[in-house]
Every structure is written in C-alpha cells, then in structure tokens.
Amino acid sequence: MVEFKIILSDTRTGHSYKMDVSGGAAGALIGKRVGTEIDAAPLGLNGYKILITGASDRNGTPSRRDLPGSGRRGLLLAGGVGFNPKEDGQRARKSIRGNEITADFVQINAKVATYGEKSLDELLAAPAAAAE
C-alpha cells in the first residue's frame, strides 16, 4: 500500500500542515507531476485545489520540475533544486528524480492554489485535537 506525507503550505497565513495519506487518496496522486494543480477533495479538503511544488523519495532524493519521467538520474548541476553551489562556476553530479509522482516517493510538498469554504485549521486540526 502506498503512503505519502504531504506538507501543505498555506500562503495566506504562512502555516504549513502535515498530512499522512494512504489508500485511495494516495493512489489519486500517483502519476501527477510536480507543478500541476490538482483537486484536493480526495485528501479530505473539499473545495480546495493544491499545487504540487516538489517531492522526495525514500532516500531523500529531490525531484525537479524540469526533469521529465519518474526515474532517478545523475545530472551535472550548476544550481537549482538538488544542489546549492558554494562558489561561482561550481558544478557537481547529483542524483535527481523526475517530476512524475510514483510509489517510491515518501514526501510531497504542495501549496494551496484555491481555497475552499472552511479554513485549513478547521479541516486538519480537528482530527488531531479529537485524538488527544
């Protein structure tokens, strides 16, 4: 069974929320690409649309929006996602994943693109408060 940790950022308030998703809701994310806007109703966020901004696999390898496919590749990078050069002109070969979400991913980063009627605090904080 596929499980994802979704880090959802609310750009209005500056807060981020962690969601653990499995089963059918996680299956709805497979095949989507980094940079696409999806409906968040399968995640329990009715009326919301989220934009997938990034992801990382079980080894911590980040995905790049500009790399098609789902596999891991060794790229010679001069900056951007996956490498932060310390000097001008510095390059390094780094492992990077493609932009397609697969079952190998563990964490998916997203931000709210369209807001629903209820606030994220109401939708996401209520189950955690009831469990305590």
UniProtKB/Swiss-Prot annotation:
A Gene Ontology BP annotation from the UniProt entry: translation
Record's keyword annotation contains Ribosomal protein: yes
Q: Would you tell me the Gene Ontology cellular component terms? A: ribonucleoprotein complex; ribosome
Q: Which UniProt keywords apply?
A: Ribonucleoprotein, Ribosomal protein
The answer, when asked if Hydrolase is one of the entry's keywords, is no
Give one GO term, molecular function aspect: structural constituent of ribosome
Cited Pfam families: Ribosomal_S6e
Per the record, the domain of life is Archaea
* Similarity comment text for this entry: Belongs to the eukaryotic ribosomal protein eS6 family.
Q: What is this protein called?
A: Small ribosomal subunit protein eS6
- The encoding gene is rps6e
